[in-house]
Amino acid sequence: KYAKIKNIDKNLVARLELDELKLSSITKTIIEITKLRDPIGVILDKWKRPNGLKIKKISIPIGVIGVIYESRPNVTVDLSCLCFKSGNSVILKGGSEAFFTNKIFVKLFRKSLKANKVNMNYVQFIERKDRKVVSSLLKDMRNYIDVMIPRGGKNLVKKVKELCNVPVIGHLEGICHTFIDKKVNTKMARNVVLNAKMRNVSICGATETLLIHKDCPKKKINLILNELKNNNCLIYADNKVRKIFSGKLKKATNKDWRKEYLDSKISVKIVKNVNEAVQHINKFGTMHTDSIITNNSVNANYFVRNVKSSIVMHNTSTQFADGGELGFGGEVGISTNKLPPRGPVGLNQLVSFKYHVAGNGQIRK
């Protein structure tokens, strides 16, 4: 209510808002995480050497995880649960927008730890709001924090990646694409595109650019674009699309291919084939999530193999780019790093490992 009175951006308000449905979703996530298998102490691999040495690769906690995040109060709960379940301590620095909500969630979590005779400091919350705290976390905590996870807008993530002197797990932007091939099921293409863009426009898995094969029937293109327009989506299209479409569309510029709108807006472009679609995605995308809609298995396989993103999809919505939806039981974020972890970082990705080497007196020659 206060945010609306102060005329704060509607997308930010949507992320801050906690209604009964969102609280129910948070509770459901907690329950799901408690049911997941303990990821610590798992034998990931084992083998025996010719000299009799027995080697095991065993999962262990990372250690202390620092998290700097904005807006979404559910992140406080997700991160606390996932870090604790994976045997890690977590230091939370939430945004000022949700300060009091975050504080209450952490208080409840720490109270629960104490009631179960567990060290409350597994979950810590930084209550100071000044920006010097963030700089200190990034520059001065190398001996205390093992990995940093930023959750928020491009500027926050960029700052963390530039200033932090410990490994960072995260992504700058979610410029996600959906490519419609020439042979598709019309109803499926229409439903998937609408969901990928409009289900929730403010999440990083929302499709921001729609690519369409040049031989896709004009009738199908008009049907799909009209579905978006009828749902109040503003379309920025290249000249080829504007000639095909029966109504009026905004003209796209080269800048639109690099935009993460996080709004009811989408850029649309005609491409020659699946190869050009892949080239466009690898040039303008952010290695987050990209999907192909096609009945052609050869094109689908080519797309999946050659798109460089951490999540590639076939005949489904990019909005499934979420740890909970992929069965991870929640996530601390999505990593677009080329080194692991990649994609949704859930419980099983919040671990490191060590090698246990057992012998019976062997010495190296």
Task: Show where each model-derived region lies.
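Structural motif
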Residues: 63-67, 82, 88-90, 121-124, ...
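ALDH superfamily catalytic-core signature
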Residues: 71-74, 78-89, 108, 115, ...
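Conserved C-terminal structural/oligomerization subdomain of aldehyde/semialdehyde dehydrogenase
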Residues: 253-365
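Rossmann-like NAD(P) dinucleotide-binding subdomain of oxidoreductase/dehydrogenase enzymes
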Residues: 35, 43-183, 187
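General structural feature for long, well-ordered alpha-helical segments within catalytic domains
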Residues: 22, 26-29, 61, 101, ...
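N-terminal Rossmann-like NAD(P)+-binding subdomain of aldehyde/semialdehyde dehydrogenases
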Residues: 1-55
